[in-house]
Amino acid sequence: MNFSRIFFFVFALVLALSTVSAAPEPKWKVFKKIEKMGRNIRNGIVKAGPAIAVLGEAKALG
């Protein structure tokens, strides 16, 4: 019976420590900056698409 109590206590302790260490760390900010940069590039390409299409049509005309 003592073994089961000790086992339960150790299991609860490990579970508590694993949930605390799962908190996000500051190093994730680097990936967020990379993601934001990629988003800005994608949005710039989407916005420039119609202008590039107009230039292509103008070049084809003459």
Curated annotation (Swiss-Prot):
Keywords: Amidation, Antibiotic, Antimicrobial, Immunity, Innate immunity, Secreted, Signal. It holds the Pfam family Cecropin. One of its GO terms (cellular component) is extracellular region. GO terms for biological process: antibacterial humoral response; defense response to Gram-positive bacterium; innate immune response. The modification Leucine amide is found at residue 61. Residues 23-26 form a propeptide. It is found in: Secreted. It comes from the Eukaryota. Residues 1-22 form the signal peptide. PROSITE patterns: CECROPIN. Cecropins have lytic and antibacterial activity against several Gram-positive and Gram-negative bacteria. Belongs to the cecropin family. This is Cecropin-B. It comes from Hyalophora cecropia (Cecropia moth).
